[in-house]
């Protein structure tokens, strides 16, 4: 069952969560500049997880194993802005970000593997790409996703394969699990009210500086227009 766009169903006990997170907005009707709430809450959740893990690493309470997702330094772009960038250019359904969180947490079940500022951005873009390919009706190629994420196509391919093999290609998520993650993200609303504002993650990786690289944005926009033109020609 695809989860790209959810429809109203009074029998679905998670319907309110879907509405709250902005998962019911059809991608074809997404014509405003607002981002679905799921992006903000996911970013807050990932920010807190990263901070917690790095505090434990600094105190030598845990030991992190380097993975293919680890960069040499952290990107200047915050997780929130990175998630918004992915959503803006990939045109994936909002539900892909919930699936991405599920895939990320499954990946992190490996011993001594923790999400930090050196790995969170790559984990996020890769998980969203895998989710979009699995659940959405249309998606781009990895060369395009690589430009969106600020990495090379070769690296995008390798990251995707690594994630898939570590997940044992088990991408299907039942509605109960999906709904529970939606509820988990909803709880971040209270955390944002009580806790500090989302902090920018400074410092990581060899991902390109997307915050100041307008040429990458123009490339993505140009590619989007080309894909849209081809799609229209195919329908004529």
UniProtKB/Swiss-Prot annotation:
InterPro entries: Cyclin-like_sf, Cyclin_P/U, Cyclin_PHO80-like. Pfam families: Cyclin. Keywords: Cell cycle, Cell division, Cyclin. GO terms for biological process: cell division. GO terms for molecular function: protein kinase binding. It comes from the Eukaryota. Belongs to the cyclin family. Cyclin U/P subfamily. This is Cyclin-P3-1. It comes from Oryza sativa subsp. japonica (Rice).
